[in-house]
């Protein structure tokens, strides 16, 4: 007879002679004395804290108001004033590695995530996902009875596995979360995001919607800063809705919520009211503003007395030397970033208010942090549209200034220039992707009204802390242990160091005194008060590159290189770095980027070697990395349809209103809109599509340079053609839709999804050859999207 494996009752001949047993699984209150394993029906203890981790993207050390900037972040500032503010917190220099380390309590390399999750290399340090021998915080807490929710950016699964076809084992629900709402890739448009709910793709809600969280919208009125949709608002609505659902039915069950905003990663987009708020605020330029922020940091005590402001990074020009148009453009790009962060802070405020309204705030450990330093992907001038750069179009400030009023809104995809990124990383040098302090030294605030000594609220913590230390700290606070075996797999040891002791006393010693860093061949090691760091040039001999040495206790901003003065100390730290590299699975060092993206398509495509992609609707939208890679390649697209004279709509769409390709039937004609950054090449067939079965073909051919051509055919007969002045190598960060237009409309000739109203039997895309330079352009684009 089959019985539950843990049945501890008694079975007699009848129910009157038997004793039932209900195995409800572990409960987090077991650790607090409220329940024990032998008495699962005892009353729960309310002392198990909730856990909420809020992660911001590409936010530099100085950019919160409480860390020195003049950007309005009153809600984060209030959390710091009522909690603890960490001044020596470090992440990895990149998105996916930080997230992997945060969620596992282990080094990113050890769990297979040395870089972004877009590729795997065949080595254990780069799997494209978190290894299964490293249980996530969600898996550990879920097994201990917590409800677990993931909202926002994931970027911890291989991108080609993020379509509706799966596999789903490395999506959030496959790694311990009960619910997920957000996006799987490295970035998304804030007004027209690629969204996933649990394990399926969904369209963004209408700007007019009901709001379960209690923030406006109860009567169906518009929600948003200017009456429109914005992803950050939606994410907070969803997080609060999940929490309300859980605590309403199971008030005895604590929750873990991981809220990872798309903000403040490019594109920098905010509601119009926030953009207007910052008009003119940064006209003084980055030199004056950076100095002011630095002086405010000294006054606030978030950098040690005597810290120097690092010199300008190479490529950052003095503001006063810039031409007028370049200054105007750069100032407006910084305004958009500030508006984006301000708006994000308001959403964090809504989250805090919602937790309070639900009666959950006081017993919630709330952690707000950034994943790496401010972004360098905007280049020296900043960009109006990142994809232009990746297509070899170097837009000058004089050209970009013509669209200055689009910055920060739905018609732009902007990132700010190096000067503002270094300002955001004040007082440090370098940026995201670098192992100097500008790339890894980021803000973190922790609030826990019930758990922190009231005397400690509003105080700073200057001890060195690393992102891998967060998970073991939270485990200690909630009273759980990371398992030695999970789902039958022996687990890697948790190598992060709990800093729970530091939360209750400012003078407690640091628990992490030895920390390595590595990114793309750049290396660093912090050992107590000392740091050795090497900035790697791709392709250079690792052994020939010079290391720098800094005494962080006296030189937090890495201004005084002691490598020549103390060669023995430097040699000691460099040797120790190699020891730590071996211990944490860092090796082999690998500075490849574009080669890996090419290998993904050439060697591991799930499609046949002839590169034929066949889609049969209805289908969910496909993310860019799972779509047919038509950028920079000649291809033939064939749509087989059955239509009446009245039928029309989109057959195929990829990209957005900023750049993309759309093929559709309108007013009886087959239409191509090839949108190269708002320069539209439109071909309308010279004959109507027959009202019957028909084969509709788009043939795109890349030329020798940056141009190409396109031709339409109906049932094999040419029906129109045109030259394409710019043949897009990297089309968009947004993927493809079959039978309708996803996200923002690629073409201005239709609105919304414009679904095809006839019968679309299939869309077949045949790639022709491999275009040189595409892998490099794709790699640059993906590295910017991390």
Outline where the language-model segments fall:
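Formylglycine-dependent sulfatase
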Residues: 1-543, 547, 556-575, 589, ...
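Charge-dense polyanion-binding interfaces
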Residues: 574-592
